[in-house]
């Protein structure tokens, strides 16, 4: 039986041919063709084969894939039944070379054409006469990791999924001169494509960067560009530059005869007045797309057209990116070379642009004096390029070369190291010393502290105040290799000793280490000495345990590699383990019966790898258990079968195999343990071992319920906190099998399956698992388990799995449809039926916590989700009842309270849509602005409130449903949580709920503003402004901003809290305080805007408290602060100047009218600052676009993990939105609103108490 993998069709040997004019070597008439003459042409192809010695009649029918192509990347590893008789399989790769000799020189023509994808490429046609061809074949071992052949436990090859032949995947026959490259034998077949039907390895590079003209002379210019971002499977071999007359001339190639090797070109003999340039890159298989055109360039044609700044600096060195974070880069460059015709630069101008665009943007307002600069406020995940220009008294100099495309990657999330007690009694280790340094890696060693100590290594970039942890799990070796560092940067390191979970003080900081290309610091630190040959500890059937003596090394040994060979297959050595092992023992399994093996060992330290040890004696693998044959250890007869096999080579008949070879790796057992546990022996001499992950997943589909129960329980243990196991479980098909177990009638199996799905879907990094659960209909089946089971523990695990799944935005609609009503009716709503009994046990249950977590996540999904949850009977009443009970019991810091408050806050978002489904925020704002004075004044409402108070005396008039959200007693609950809770997530959500309720222009919002004042909530909120957590301060400040719409609230805030708000503004000339975000500053400016424009007295107080100086400095602080913050500060200054009675005081302070204006800010520009604010905060789904009034950086969907519960808890939402204007309808409606409700109870009343601050 023969199956071919990656078999490529041969290109036909060139035939004889003549030109149309009858001449054998006629001249070419087509100008698009290029003629060359060669003496020899080589073509080669490679074929991979798989040969099995199993008789064809004994092979299962599904294995017969003779006429189909097998994709080696899609090889599976399921078990197959053992076949009778000896079985073997061997894989080989053959390289066929053809050498052609010509009596007359060949003629080669290059034709340019455009393929189906629109890509411009070049095709070569060769015509020769009297060809003599010699073919040679050479067998090469299959070594590519993309073409591994899998075998089952009996040594049989497992079939791979079959795909149709794709002509685009056929190997191109290479024709050219007899160069070393073309005649080189390939040792492995080409890598398999990344997907079955898409061949990404096209060899055609992407478009280069937009070209720039950096220098110009009379009739000539210098053009530079950036290399392509993707080479798509091959190096860029050159560039072609094209030019056209601006604006609509034809593009003309300027490099027909040769490719440009560098990314710069001097173009001469130009006669056009104004031109544009573009560049395309040439890869392995042709030209890629052209870049975008450059900016139009005027060509100097005389001395008068040249630039007059002759003394300007020369171009600085190409800027290098030495650090990248989520929104900025740190650049470094070298100064321009000294020139007698120009003075040195007085400073530098840094410019940047989006990669692929033409316009350069100036990044710095003031000239940079140093050779480093940080460009900030860049778009995360954007690609930019940078350049630098010097400037002196003679003008702006030539620009530097572009840095090339730089991707602005978000900073990697940092994992928090568990807090450990620090004690002076633990001796710190010695100063870490560099052993080896590379581009992005450093190897360190240090003197150990005490005998049983473990070590944590920390590092930081020079200038970074924060230390980062290199290894979160303490290591026992006194050496480490730190990887993934920023290239061309500088670092320092320190080490901490850990003894019995008690940490020492950090060691002395290492010397500063510069990351440079790899170099050894000392030749006196060699690799480990060669080990002695390994010995056999135990042989049992197809498993063998080997051991060896520890290596002798001057540096700590960092692990061992074990290699094996099987002489029945070939004499090459192959690795057993994927990762180095630390123990001096290993059990190797799945060996082939009646084969003879040898083993050898290599040791690693920080300096490198030792030479392989001498090979072990041969060991013969026999079926009998625990037999160790000394005969087979000495000189076993290998039993080669000298039977010549044949492979059918396309069009060339039968070719005998020169050597039969198979690449086969025997992994240790279990597969993922780098020091596998030995076989275990019971008293009755029964032996066993732990199953591998594949075996565990196979057991899930067993018909034996005991195996299902044990396998699902063990898989739950394996998937806990191990992301790689979670990924492999998905890849091995474990998720559909777990979901199938949800239909089991055994509660313990259902519980284990739910727990596994909970672990697999924990964490943002496992979103692929969540999607796999949804695609396998897992959400509906988990919800069905919740509906039908009576087992409380099963319900807890099912709700926990849904909580983790609901953190993914794409699953929220599915969970909303399948599970929210079940959770609400069966878990939350029955709270109201508890009656007089103590509900503490129910409220404190894990099921209640998990259920509120699911609803919390789903409530942030969409407008439809909010409406559906609000309409669930008794849901809102149950949540309010729970919060009331928690406050009475002083249990306000629990995760369940956090979930409930966040859920209520999200349901309060745009709550006016409850009574007005067609609610338009812009229209509502416009109409309310016309009646602003009427809405804010309590006097016109007095009669109406008196009537409603009479109505409230009716005991049957009970408020239910969404109207409960804006009742005064609910607002009082939020204020009580703000006073008593120490959970910052609960604080933020409580403030956000008040913010949302006060954000609209209808009567219930006005009554909420009054209720907060009546309940003495204003000083509670102002007190929280002093907290260090910025996202809490932002939510509180925004809530106060909305409450300040009420005139009396605004007066009280201006009288008692003005100094607190001004303290949040940065001092003039001081560096930025990272602890205060632009959103928080924007909210504070919104409060000041309301206070200042309504009162000259408070405006005077702002000025006397140095607020004017802070606002003036803030309005000119771009780009340190965002453009929006600067604009807000300008608007506050503008309304301050509108109080004409204060002009004299301003002028006595040395200020004039121009100091209160910035740019083009006018009254009409205050539309954004005057808007009330509402938000879902950080829980808003990332798929929803933010309103254009939002400041940058307010990300949503941030998740944090609760390791104790093993579930994913989204962080509470920050209320970060922008205020709505009163005097005009904004161009784009904001994304926030509130709810209408007929007069709530007791919110209002006039009296002195209504105006009291405390």
UniProtKB/Swiss-Prot annotation:
Q: Report biased composition (Polar residues) as residue ranges.
A: 145-157, 1166-1176
* Start-end of each ARM repeat: 733-775, 777-820, 874-922, 969-1012, 1016-1058
For this record, the Gene Ontology CC terms, alphabetical, are: adherens junction; catenin complex; cytoplasm; nucleus; plasma membrane
Domain Fibronectin type-III residue range list:
207-302, 315-411, 428-518, 530-624
- Mark out the compositionally biased spans (Acidic residues): 12-22
Name the segments for region: Disordered. 1-38, 84-106, 145-209, 412-433, 662-685, 920-960, 1159-1254
Query: Any idea where this protein resides?
Result: Cell junction, Adherens junction; Nucleus
Q: Which Gene3D superfamilies match?
A: Immunoglobulins, Leucine-rich Repeat Variant
Taxonomically, which superkingdom?
Eukaryota
Membrane-crossing ranges are none
Q: What happens when the gene is disrupted?
A: Embryos are viable, but display a partial loss of junctional component, pac-1, from adherens junctions.
Q: What does this protein do?
A: May act as a positive modulator of hmr-1 function during epidermal morphogenesis. Required for proper localization of other junctional components, such as pac-1.
What name has this protein been given in UniProt? Juxtamembrane domain-associated catenin
Gene name for this UniProt entry: jac-1
């Amino acid at each position: 039986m023969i199956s071919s993998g990656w078999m490529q069709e041969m290109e036909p040997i060139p035939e004889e041919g003549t030109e149309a004019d009858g001449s054998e070597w006629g001249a070419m008439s087509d100008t698009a063709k290029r003629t060359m003459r060669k003496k020899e042409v080589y073509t080669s192809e490679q074929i991979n084969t798989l040969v099995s010695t199993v008789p064809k009649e004994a092979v299962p029918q599904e294995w017969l894939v003779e006429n189909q192509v097998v994709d080696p990347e899609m090889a599976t590893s399921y078990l197959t039944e053992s076949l009778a008789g000896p079985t073997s399989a061997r894989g080989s790769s053959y390289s066929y070379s053809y050498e052609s000799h010509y009596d007359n020189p060949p003629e080669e023509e290059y034709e340019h054409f455009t393929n189906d994808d629109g890509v411009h490429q070049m095709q070569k046609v060769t015509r020769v006469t009297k060809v003599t061809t010699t073919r040679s074949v050479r067998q090469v071992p299959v070594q590519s990791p993309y073409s591994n052949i899998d075998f089952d436990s009996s040594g049989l090859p497992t079939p791979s999924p079959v795909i149709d032949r794709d002509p685009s995947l056929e190997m191109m026959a290479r024709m050219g001169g007899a160069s070393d490259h073309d005649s080189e034998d390939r040792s492995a077949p080409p890598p398999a494509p990344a997907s079955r039907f898409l061949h990404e390895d096209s060899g055609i590079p992407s478009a280069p960067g937009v070209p720039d003209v950096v220098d110009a002379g009379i009739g000539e210019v210098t053009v530079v560009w950036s290399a392509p971002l993707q080479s798509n499977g091959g190096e860029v071999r050159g560039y072609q530059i094209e030019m056209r007359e601006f604006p609509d001339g034809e593009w003309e190639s300027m490099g027909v005869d040769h490719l440009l090797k560098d990314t710069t070109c001097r173009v001469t003999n130009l006669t056009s007045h104004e031109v544009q340039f573009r560049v395309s890159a040439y890869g392995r298989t042709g030209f890629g797309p052209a870049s975008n055109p450059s900016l139009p360039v005027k060509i100097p044609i005389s001395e008068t057209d040249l630039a007059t700044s002759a003394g300007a600096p020369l171009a600085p060195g190409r800027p290098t990116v030495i650090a990248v974070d989520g929104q900025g880069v740190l650049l470094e460059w070298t100064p321009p070379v000294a020139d007698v015709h120009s003075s040195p630069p007085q400073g530098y101008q840094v410019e940047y642009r989006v990669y692929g665009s033409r316009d350069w943007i100036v990044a710095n307002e003031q000239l940079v004096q140093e050779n480093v600069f940080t460009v900030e406020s860049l778009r995360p995940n954007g690609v930019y390029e940078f350049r630098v220009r010097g400037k002196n008294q003679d003008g702006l100099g030539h620009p530097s070369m572009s840095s090339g495309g730089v991707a602005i990657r978000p900073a990697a999330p940092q994992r928090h190291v568990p807090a450990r007690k620090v004690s002076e009694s633990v001796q710190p280790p010695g100063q870490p010393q560099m052993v080896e340094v590379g581009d992005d890696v450093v190897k360190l060693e240090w003197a150990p502290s005490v005998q049983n100590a473990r070590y944590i290594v920390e590092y930081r970039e020079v200038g970074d105040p924060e230390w980062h942890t290199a290894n979160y799990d303490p290591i026992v070796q006194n050496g480490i290799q730190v990887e993934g560092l920023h290239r061309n940067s500088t670092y320092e390191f320190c080490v901490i000793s850990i003894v019995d979970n008690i940490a020492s003080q950090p060691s002395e900081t290492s010397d500063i280490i510069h990351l440079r290309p790899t170099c050894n610091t000392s030749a006196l630190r060699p690799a480990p000495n060669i080990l002695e040959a390994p010995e056999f500890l135990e042989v049992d059937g197809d498993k063998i345990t080997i051991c060896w003596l520890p290596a002798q090394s001057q540096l700590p040994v960092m692990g061992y590699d074990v290699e094996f060979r099987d002489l029945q297959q070939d004499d090459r050595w192959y690795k057993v383990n994927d990762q180095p092992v630390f123990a001096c023992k290993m059990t190797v399994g799945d060996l082939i019966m009646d084969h003879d093996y040898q083993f050898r060992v290599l040791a690693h330290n920080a300096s490198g790898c030792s030479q392989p040890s001498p090979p072990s004696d041969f060991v013969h693998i026999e079926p009998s258990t625990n037999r160790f044959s000394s005969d087979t250890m000495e000189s076993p007869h290998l039993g080669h079968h000298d039977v010549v096999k044949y492979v059918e080579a396309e069009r060339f008949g039968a070719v005998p195999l020169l050597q039969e070879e198979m690449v086969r790796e025997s992994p240790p057992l279990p597969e993922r343990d780098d020091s596998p546990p030995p076989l275990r022996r019971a008293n009755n001499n029964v032996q066993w071992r732990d199953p591998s992950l594949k075996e565990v997943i196979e057991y899930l589909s067993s018909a034996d319920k005991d195996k299902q129960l044990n396998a699902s329980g063990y898989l739950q243990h394996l998937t806990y906190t191990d992301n790689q196991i979670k990924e492999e479980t998905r890849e091995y098909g474990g998720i559909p099998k777990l979901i199938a177990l949800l239909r089991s009638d055994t509660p313990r199996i259902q519980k284990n399956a739910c727990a596994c799905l909970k672990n697999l879907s924990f964490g943002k990094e496992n979103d692929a698992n969540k999607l796999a659960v949804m695609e396998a209909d897992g959400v509906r089946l988990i919800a069905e388990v919740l509906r039908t089971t009576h087992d409380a523990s099963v319900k807890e695990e099912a709700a926990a799995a849904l909580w983790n799944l609901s953190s993914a935005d794409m699953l929220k609609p599915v969970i909303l449809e399948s599970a929210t009503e079940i959770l609400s009716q069966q878990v939350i709503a029955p709270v109201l039926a508890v009656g007089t009994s103590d509900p503490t046990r129910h409220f404190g249950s894990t099921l209640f916590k998990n259920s509120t977590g699911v609803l919390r996540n789903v409530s942030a999904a969409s407008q439809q989700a909010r409406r559906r949850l609000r309409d669930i009977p008794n849901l809102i009443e149950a949540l309010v009842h729970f919060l009331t009970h928690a406050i009475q019991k002083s249990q306000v810091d629990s995760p369940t309270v956090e979930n409930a408050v966040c859920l209520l806050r999200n349901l309060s978002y745009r709550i006016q849509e409850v009574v007005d489904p067609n609610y338009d925020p812009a229209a509502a704002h416009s109409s309310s602005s016309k009646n602003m004075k009427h809405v804010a004044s309590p006097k016109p409402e007095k009669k109406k409130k008196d009537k409603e108070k009479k109505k409230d005396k009716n005991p049957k008039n009970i408020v239910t449903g969404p109207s409960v959200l804006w009742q005064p007693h609910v607002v009082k609950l939020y204020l009580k949580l703000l006073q008593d809770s120490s959970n910052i997530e609960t604080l933020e959500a409580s403030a956000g709920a008040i913010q949302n309720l006060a954000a609209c222009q209808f009567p219930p919002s006005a009554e909420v503003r009054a209720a907060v004042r009546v309940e003495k909530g204003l000083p509670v909120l102002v007190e929280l402004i002093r907290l260090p957590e910025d996202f809490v301060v932002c939510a509180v400040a925004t809530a106060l901003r909305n409450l300040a719409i009420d005139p009396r609230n605004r007066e009280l805030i201006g009288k008692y809290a003005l100094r607190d708000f001004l303290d949040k503004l940065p001092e003039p000339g001081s560096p930025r305080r990272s602890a205060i975000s632009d959103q928080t500053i924007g909210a504070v400016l919104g409060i000041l805007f309301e206070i200042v424009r309504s009162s000259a007295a408070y405006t005077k107080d702002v000025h006397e408290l140095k607020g004017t100086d802070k606002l003036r400095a803030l309005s000119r602080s771009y780009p340190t602060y965002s453009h929006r913050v600067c604009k807000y500060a300008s608007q506050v200054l503008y309304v301050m100047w509108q109080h004409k009675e204060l002009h004299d005081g301003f002028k006595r302070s040395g200020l004039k009218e121009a100091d209160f204006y910035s740019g083009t800010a006018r009254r009409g520009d205050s539309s954004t600052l005057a808007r009330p604010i509402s938000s879902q905060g950080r829980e808003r789904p990332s798929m929803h676009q933010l309103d254009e009034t939002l400041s940058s950086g307010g990300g949503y969907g941030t998740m944090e993990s609760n390791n104790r519960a093993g579930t994913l808890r989204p962080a509470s939402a920050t209320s970060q939105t922008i205020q709505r204007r009163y005097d005009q309808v904004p161009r784009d409606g904001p994304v926030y609103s509130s709810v209408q409700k007929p007069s709530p109870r007791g919110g209002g009343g006039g009296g002195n108490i209504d105006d009291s601050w405390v």
